[in-house]
């Protein structure tokens, strides 16, 4: 599969099954097969989670940042295998060493940098970092498992 960068949201949807309001990636900006992927998400006040988290102090929920990091990891795995195959999914399988270093608010641009650490029998282990303005907001080790359904 020839990967042309950047990969925009409409084409990300051809790679991963997530859709609004759960698709958390806006663009893939860098990719090295079986190694690294960089993606971005523009955080806007129009996103549904900000109606309740929190109305007077909107803060991006940490679990959604982790989900976005997992989507980036799954996208790295799928692109590394040449694209999405029918009935094949990469599921979020685990998380270790998660640390939340700064709040993410509407107007921020999240930059996700994910690196494949190991891949064995359909399970990938990734180092994932989410940054805002070059500062680490969230970091974690994420596992994704491939499954045919």
Swiss-Prot record:
GO terms for cellular component: cytoplasm; membrane. It comes from the Bacteria. Its main location: cytoplasm. It is found in: Cytoplasm. This is 3-hydroxyacyl-[acyl-carrier-protein] dehydratase FabZ. Belongs to the thioester dehydratase family. FabZ subfamily. Involved in unsaturated fatty acids biosynthesis. Catalyzes the dehydration of short chain beta-hydroxyacyl-ACPs and long chain saturated and unsaturated beta-hydroxyacyl-ACPs. InterPro entries: FabA_FabZ (IPR013114), FabZ (IPR010084), HotDog_dom_sf (IPR029069). It holds the Pfam family FabA. CDD domains: FabZ (cd01288). GO terms for molecular function: (3R)-hydroxyacyl-[acyl-carrier-protein] dehydratase activity. It catalyses: a (3R)-hydroxyacyl-[ACP] = a (2E)-enoyl-[ACP] + H2O. Its EC number is 4.2.1.59. Keywords: Cytoplasm, Lipid A biosynthesis, Lipid biosynthesis, Lipid metabolism, Lyase. The active site is at 53. GO terms for biological process: fatty acid biosynthetic process; lipid A biosynthetic process. Transmembrane segments: none annotated. It is an enzyme of class 4 (lyase).
